[in-house]
Design a protein with these regions (language model features):
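Short, catalytically relevant binding-site loops at active-site mouths
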Residues: 49-52
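Basic/aromatic-rich interaction segments and small domains that mediate binding to polyanionic partners
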Residues: 1-47, 62-135, 143
Length: 144
């Protein structure tokens, strides 16, 4: 079985046949599964630059301004402690309102944010949390 086949099997075990289930019901099923399975707290970081960062990371934004803004805004380069996950949270830092919210605390200064769970990954690639978050992110971005 390939890595992708194994991932598809894990996802199907959580949501069932997602073609027969509404997107919201699948998100609920993932929330229930992750609530029971994630080992919190755990260290996480961004999968890729957060929405607000694109202007600075791949656009014409000033590096000096980017560093200034990073002091008060979450960055994909930061390491956070994922302390909880929640449903129906809307945060300016989340790219998709349908996403589950990860309540995170930045390790460098203790600032707390809500980030989209599909936008973060566990730092420890060998942990069960890495696989759980990756499975959710893959399902979410492919089905939203």
């Amino acid at each position: 079985m390939t890595r992708l086949d194994a991932q598809d099997a894990r996802i199907e075990a959580i949501v069932g046949n997602d073609e027969e289930t509404s997107f919201d019901d699948c998100v609920d099923k993932f929330y229930d599964h992750l609530s029971k399975s994630l080992q919190l707290p755990c260290d996480v970081t961004g999968i890729e630059d957060f929405r607000w960062e694109e202007y600075y990371v791949i656009g014409p934004g000033s590096p000096k301004e980017y560093e200034r803004l990073r002091k008060n805004q979450p960055s994909y380069q930061d390491t956070f402690e994922l302390v909880a996950i929640e449903q129906e949270v809307h945060s300016e830092w989340m790219m998709f309102y349908e996403d589950l919210a990860g309540c995170v605390r930045r390790k460098s200064d203790g600032k707390e944010f809500y980030l989209g769970l599909a936008e973060i990954k566990a730092v420890d690639k060998k942990s069960v949390n890495y696989q759980l978050l990756d499975d959710y992110a893959v399902w979410f971005v492919n089905n939203r």
